């Protein structure tokens, strides 16, 4: 199947399709694409995520300012989960061109669900909607960086088809970082 074939495009604020099997666990949680009007909420969720894992970084207000710009771009995707009017989770993805494919590569930068609502299928719904959206935008591959010691995250992504071994290879892929 070619990128985007059999998928649906979603506009910011559009409700994404229901996923069978999670209705009982998720209750009234809905998943939708974020737009610029959601910058405050996404900024606060990202700050909450950073605080939960003792990560220093921008304030919620600084994140909000950045999301005001990012959410208007076509190469940034944010999927939000909403529970009775309260945003309770999100995924942030960026897309970039590559000479290896006709479509784009996507990087799943962050995926977060508030602690009290974890293990209810919300993260799976968010990830599923993110994958559908990236495919609809012509994406052909999605990358995610996961800390080696974060076994829960590794198990989650592996359950959803991610691997740290490239097809046809027998060795793990590694991620390297240099602060600039």
Can you describe what each PLM-predicted range is?
Residues 114-116, 120, 148-149:
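Active-site acidic-Proline motif in GNAT/NAT acetyltransferases
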Residues 121, 138, 161:
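Short glycine-rich hinge loops at helix-strand junctions in the catalytic core
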Residues 6-37:
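Conserved N-terminal entry element of GNAT/NAT acetyltransferase domains
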Residues 134-146:
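Conserved GNAT acetyl-CoA-binding A-motif
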Residues 124, 148-166, 171-174:
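Conserved active-site alpha-helix within GNAT-family acetyltransferase domains
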Residues 5-6, 45, 158:
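N-terminal leader/targeting signatures
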Residues 27-29, 33-103, 109, 114, ...:
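Acetyl-CoA-dependent GNAT
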């Amino acid at each position: 199947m070619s990128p985007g074939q059999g998928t649906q495009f979603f506009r910011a604020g559009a409700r994404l399709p229901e996923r069978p099997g999670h209705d009982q666990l998720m209750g009234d949680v809905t998943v939708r694409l974020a737009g610029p009007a959601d910058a405050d909420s996404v900024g606060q969720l990202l700050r909450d995520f950073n605080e939960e894992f003792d990560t220093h970084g921008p304030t919620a207000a600084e994140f909000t300012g950045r999301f005001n710009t990012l959410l208007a771009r076509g190469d940034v995707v944010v999927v939000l989960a909403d529970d009775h009017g309260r945003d309770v989770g999100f995924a942030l993805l960026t897309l970039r061109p590559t000479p290896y494919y006709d479509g784009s590569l996507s990087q799943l930068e962050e995926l977060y669900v508030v602690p009290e609502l974890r293990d209810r299928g919300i993260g799976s719904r968010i990830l599923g909607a993110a994958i559908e959206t990236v495919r609809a935008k012509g994406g052909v591959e999605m990358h995610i960086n996961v800390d080696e010691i974060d076994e829960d995250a590794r198990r989650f992504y592996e359950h959803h088809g991610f691997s740290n071994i490239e097809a046809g290879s027998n060795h793990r892929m590694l991620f390297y970082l240099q602060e600039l």
